[in-house]
């Protein structure tokens, strides 16, 4: 019997404005999650989906010993989930609108994952935002807002 493929899935990140106790008595803090449809799409008797936690050295808890190295060695491939737009700063631009700041924490985390998996010779697949991140990781650029930046498109 062969072992199933172990496919890493990048975490989507929920950043609350500040940690608060919600009505259910649960502290709302930074959360990592996997979109259910992605899990359903990946999972089969031959594939185990493994969410890779985001490691950020700029977080509230300072841990300089955390690393994503082991995931690229242990897993057979990587899927980058969709979600919010990339932070324009990630591809060398300032946001055209204050609401378009993106998620620089997730960008750094996923760019690190891409680098590690590519160096390990492992396949990487991007879903929506993940495709945009792969484009930027390999030197590409993005339009922040196609209707205002490319009205003829």
Model-derived features: where do they sit?
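Glycine-rich beta-to-alpha active-site loop
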Residues: 126, 131
